[in-house]
């Protein structure tokens, strides 16, 4: 499974949004209705799923689904 698909599944599960709304350009706050607590929980779930730690200063830069996917992809390089 591609990283985008894994991230998308986590977002759909955690936020209860329609999978069609989860695109790389989708903003967690503006498009998916996430608040800061939702985003913190998403970051923790991504850390668990991908076996990594996302520093707070990096987590603050994750505003869109694409940001999250790019962060994960860069870890794997």
UniProtKB/Swiss-Prot annotation:
<keyword id="KW-0443">Lipid metabolism</keyword>
<dbReference type="InterPro" id="IPR006162">
    <property type="entry name" value="Ppantetheine_attach_site"/>
</dbReference>
<dbReference type="GO" id="GO:0016020">
    <property type="term" value="C:membrane"/>
</dbReference>
<keyword id="KW-0276">Fatty acid metabolism</keyword>
<keyword id="KW-0963">Cytoplasm</keyword>
<comment type="function">
    <text>Carrier of the growing fatty acid chain in fatty acid biosynthesis.</text>
</comment>
<comment type="pathway">
    <text>Lipid metabolism; fatty acid biosynthesis.</text>
</comment>
<dbReference type="InterPro" id="IPR009081">
    <property type="entry name" value="PP-bd_ACP"/>
</dbReference>
<comment type="similarity">
    <text>Belongs to the acyl carrier protein (ACP) family.</text>
</comment>
<keyword id="KW-0444">Lipid biosynthesis</keyword>
<dbReference type="InterPro" id="IPR036736">
    <property type="entry name" value="ACP-like_sf"/>
</dbReference>
<dbReference type="GO" id="GO:0000036">
    <property type="term" value="F:acyl carrier activity"/>
</dbReference>
<protein>
    <recommendedName>
        <fullName>Acyl carrier protein</fullName>
    </recommendedName>
</protein>
<keyword id="KW-0275">Fatty acid biosynthesis</keyword>
<dbReference type="InterPro" id="IPR003231">
    <property type="entry name" value="ACP"/>
</dbReference>
<feature type="domain" description="Carrier">
    <location>
        <begin position="1"/>
        <end position="76"/>
    </location>
</feature>
<feature type="modified residue" description="O-(pantetheine 4'-phosphoryl)serine">
    <location>
        <position position="36"/>
    </location>
</feature>
<keyword id="KW-0596">Phosphopantetheine</keyword>
<dbReference type="GO" id="GO:0000035">
    <property type="term" value="F:acyl binding"/>
</dbReference>
<dbReference type="GO" id="GO:0009245">
    <property type="term" value="P:lipid A biosynthetic process"/>
</dbReference>
<dbReference type="GO" id="GO:0005829">
    <property type="term" value="C:cytosol"/>
</dbReference>
<keyword id="KW-0597">Phosphoprotein</keyword>
<dbReference type="Pfam" id="PF00550">
    <property type="entry name" value="PP-binding"/>
</dbReference>
